[in-house]
């Protein structure tokens, strides 16, 4: 919203898409998009930076955040101030599907290589929100979720892991 307000003016055309990490990089590389928003962490940084270099793209960090989980307000962990990975073992892990050609380095979530007893992959934000509110499922993210998207139904709880999520834009 702030980007549209800041860049708007008398006439403009914005196309805002939610997509897979690899597709976002390729869209900017092939000039289908002027910029993309992705994240880096210690696990994916080398592979994504290599892909960005090969694509003549630059990552500019906007901010960094400690990981959080998003859960529905009726989740058994909803009253906790913090959670750790052991607390999540019996709950469904909700992640974004990345397609056939993409490795786990292009995952939308950190800690993507961990095995989960229960796992559900989705392709869109609406489905993941429905699953968070309708099951005991969780997803790992930056902790930033606009209130208009979640209302009071989704809550964010800090996750005790030694990881930092660096969110930024990619451009030429």
What kind of feature is each model-predicted range?
Residues 27-35, 39, 98-155:
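Hydrophobic hinge/microswitch elements
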Residues 22-29, 59, 85, 128-129:
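Short hydrophobic/charged patches on amphipathic alpha-helices used for structural packing
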Residues 51-93:
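Flexible hinge/capping segments at coil-to-helix
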Residues 1-48:
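Central regulatory/effector-binding core of bacterial HTH transcription factors
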Residues 52-60, 64-66, 126-172:
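Beta-alpha-beta core module
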Residues 18-22, 56, 82, 122-125:
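Structural motif corresponding to alpha-helix initiation and N-cap regions
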Residues 45-46, 77, 85-114:
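Secondary-structure junction motif
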Residues 13-17, 60, 119-121, 157:
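General small-molecule cofactor/ligand-binding pocket signal
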């Amino acid at each position: 919203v702030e980007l549209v307000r800041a860049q708007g003016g008398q006439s403009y055309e914005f196309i805002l898409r939610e997509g897979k990490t690899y597709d976002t990089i390729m869209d900017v590389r092939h000039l289908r998009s002027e910029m993309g928003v992705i994240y880096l962490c210690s696990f994916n940084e080398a592979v994504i930076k290599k892909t960005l270099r090969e694509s003549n793209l630059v990552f500019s960090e906007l901010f960094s955040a400690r990981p959080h989980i998003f859960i529905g307000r009726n989740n058994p962990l909803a009253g906790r101030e913090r959670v750790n990975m052991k607390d999540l073992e019996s709950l469904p892990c909700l992640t974004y599907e990345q397609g056939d050609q993409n490795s786990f380095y292009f995952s939308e979530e950190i800690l993507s290589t961990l095995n989960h007893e229960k796992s559900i992959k989705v392709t869109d934000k609406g489905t993941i929100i429905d699953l968070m509110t309708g099951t005991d499922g969780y997803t790992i993210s930056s902790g930033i979720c606009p209130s208009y998207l979640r209302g009071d139904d989704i809550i964010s709880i800090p996750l005790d892991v030694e990881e930092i999520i660096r969110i930024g834009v990619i451009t030429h």
